[in-house]
């Protein structure tokens, strides 16, 4: 008799465990559907999160009582006995959700939040590539300027300024990787992108030291400024999870291309007013 009782307890426990479902959700989900089906529900249907009521539907009076913390909650389709809970992301909390009527619990669902990357892998890789190439071209510009003119205070300022920009963006890259949506990664992305405005200052310094400030240089500077504006706009649109980073990448790519043009102009159009060692 004792063995039979133990076996029954084991079977009941097994049934409860196997009837519990686990559903994962991410910040990319606008709404979450928690499934539950009740054949011919009688007096009421109730959804709970742990031991707190979320939604109670009275079949007799056709009324729904909602928790003040879950105002977006609603039932899927009462006519088809589908009483799945539909709830928006802003009201979702991880935990154990139970669906029951007056005869007892019908469904138990464990809701688990899964964290996703801020940007997809392709966009993240391009961000690092564009930033790395831009910094490399900046280094080449400063190096070319340094060997082309006699050392002066202005040249020293240019070199120090370039080193500071590189250090800030490299530190930002380390903070940003991997691209999760946390305060640390947001700060990292800001450090990677916002110092790009100072590249324009280094560019003006380089062309001024080499006596090459011309209309073409102004076009390059305006082009880079347009890239920076795109970057800032893309950054503003990216300060939330599950976004498309195309606009941000367009800005970073434009800045990288302008650095290419700057280096080509420095090398291919020598100034007759340069002072060599």
Swiss-Prot record:
Biological processes per GO annotation: positive regulation of cell-cell adhesion; positive regulation of inflammatory response; positive regulation of phagocytosis
Bilayer-crossing regions: 124-144, 156-176, 186-206, 219-239, 247-267
InterPro entries: CD47, CD47-like_TM, CD47_Vset, Ig-like_fold
Keyword annotations of the record: Glycoprotein, Host membrane, Membrane, Transmembrane, Transmembrane helix
Subcellular localization, as worded in the UniProt entry: Host membrane
MF GO annotations: thrombospondin receptor activity
GO cellular component terms, A-Z: extracellular exosome; host cell membrane; plasma membrane
Gene3D superfamilies: Immunoglobulins
Pfam families attached to this UniProt entry: CD47, V-set_CD47
Annotated glycan sites: 29, 58
Membrane topology term: Multi-pass membrane protein
Principal subcellular localization: host cell
Domain of life the protein comes from: Viruses
Protein purpose: Promotes, when overexpressed, the influx of extracellular Ca(2+), leading to membrane permeability and host cell necrosis.
Protein family membership: Belongs to the orthopoxvirus OPG166 protein family.
Protein's name in the database: Protein OPG166
Organism name: Variola virus (isolate Human/India/Ind3/1967)
């Amino acid at each position: 008799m004792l063995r039979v009782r133990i076996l029954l307890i084991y079977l009941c426990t097994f049934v409860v465990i196997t009837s519990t479902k686990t559903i994962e959700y991410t910040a990319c989900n606008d709404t979450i559907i928690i499934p539950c089906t009740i054949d011919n529900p009688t007096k009421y249907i109730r959804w709970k999160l742990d031991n707190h009521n979320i939604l109670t539907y009275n079949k007799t009076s056709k009324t729904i009582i909602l928790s003040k913390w879950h105002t977006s909650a609603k039932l899927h389709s009462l006519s088809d006995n589908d009483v799945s809970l539909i709830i928006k992301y802003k009201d979702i909390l991880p935990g154990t959700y139970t669906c029951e009527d007056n005869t007892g619990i019908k469904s138990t669902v464990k809701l688990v939040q899964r964290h996703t990357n801020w940007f997809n892998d392709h966009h993240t890789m391009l961000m690092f590539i564009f930033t790395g190439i831009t910094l490399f071209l900046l280094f080449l510009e400063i190096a070319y300027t340094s060997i082309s003119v006699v050392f002066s205070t202005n040249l020293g300022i240019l070199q120090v300024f370039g080193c500071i920009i590189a250090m800030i963006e490299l530190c930002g890259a380390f903070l940003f990787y991997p691209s999760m949506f946390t305060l640390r990664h947001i700060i990292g992305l800001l450090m990677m992108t916002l110092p790009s405005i100072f590249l324009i200052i280094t560019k003006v310094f380089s062309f001024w030291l080499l006596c090459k400030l011309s209309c073409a240089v102004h076009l390059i500077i305006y082009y880079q400024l347009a890239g920076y504006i795109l970057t800032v706009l893309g950054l503003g649109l990216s300060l939330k999870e599950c976004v498309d980073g195309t606009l941000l990448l367009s800005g970073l790519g434009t800045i990288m291309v302008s650095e290419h043009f700057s280096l080509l102009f420095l090398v291919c159009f020598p100034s007759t007013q340069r002072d060599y060692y």
